[in-house]
């Protein structure tokens, strides 16, 4: 198996958040499933490198890219990533490790309760005394009289 991307301490935080494995069939149970830690290693490797799921190297021992993708999908549906995000933020806050001085707040993430100051009616733009070069008719070229 590939070197784990996450250390044991972080894994002990993540493991309880993962949903229990699906029960295996008694008759024809198929292959043994890939461990959650191996699948997480594959998921993080693909997301970090930008590799396509199908190009995940088999030598990593993370299962196929499809297996990792399915695990990612299932964990997303189970709310694992949201809970992990909340847990890590709480731990960082408790350790006073969050620096909000570099945070950027987007206007779409904070509701503007009131509108800006109301202005009067915008005055009409005065007509430009110089004719426009883009909308003036093309001058006709006069030919010299034929001799």
Curated annotation (Swiss-Prot):
Domain of life: Bacteria
Keyword list, A-Z: Transposable element
InterPro entries: IS402-like_dom, Transposase_6_like
The keyword Phosphoprotein appears for this protein: no
Region (Disordered): 106-147
Biased composition (Low complexity): 129-147
One protein family per Pfam: DUF4096
KW Repeat (keyword) present: no
Record-stated family: Belongs to the transposase 6 family.
PANTHER family: BLL5188 PROTEIN, TIS1421-TRANSPOSASE PROTEIN A
Name of this chain's protein: Insertion element IS402 uncharacterized 16.2 kDa protein
Organism: Burkholderia cepacia
């Amino acid at each position: 198996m590939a070197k784990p991307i996450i250390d044991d301490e972080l894994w002990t935080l993540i493991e309880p958040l993962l949903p229990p494995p699906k029960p295996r069939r008694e008759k024809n149970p198929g292959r043994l499933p890939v461990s959650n830690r191996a699948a997480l290693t594959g998921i993080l490797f693909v997301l970090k490198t930008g590799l396509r799921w199908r190009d995940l190297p088999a030598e990593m021992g993370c299962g196929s890219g499809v297996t990792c993708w399915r695990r990612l999908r299932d964990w997303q549906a189970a709310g694992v990533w949201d809970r992990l995000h909340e847990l890590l933020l709480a731990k960082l806050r408790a350790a006073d490790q969050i620096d909000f001085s570099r945070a950027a707040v987007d206007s779409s993430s904070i509701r503007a309760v009131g509108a800006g100051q109301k202005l009067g009616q915008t005055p009409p733009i005065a007509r430009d005394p110089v004719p426009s070069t883009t909308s003036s008719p093309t001058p006709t070229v006069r030919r010299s009289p034929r001799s």
